[in-house]
Amino acid sequence: KDLELDEVTYNVKNYDVIVTNPPYKLAKEFVLRGFEVAREQYLLLRLSFLEGQKRYQELFSKKHLKGVYIFTARITCSEGIEETPTANSVAYCWLHFDKEFVGQPTLYWI
């Protein structure tokens, strides 16, 4: 079942940090909702999440992205089973948002 954002976050209160691997199609909404309930967020997302003018305007132009932790090896994700990278492996990263941070993010390779 595909969950809507409200079904996942309706009962979320205030936290210091959120660590999540959100559904890609709702990732922007998770970040925006995360700013309402936590100071810091770490989200495992495709590296391509950093692309796009609309996402830049709504998220990245606010300067709250503190760090980008880029996996040096591509990752294959299939139903929680770790596998050898294949041709359809994807570039992933951890994005670290901090709503009190204002500035340019630092890049890290992991």
Go through each PLM region and give its residues.
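Class I S-adenosyl-L-methionine-dependent methyltransferase catalytic core
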Residues: 1-110
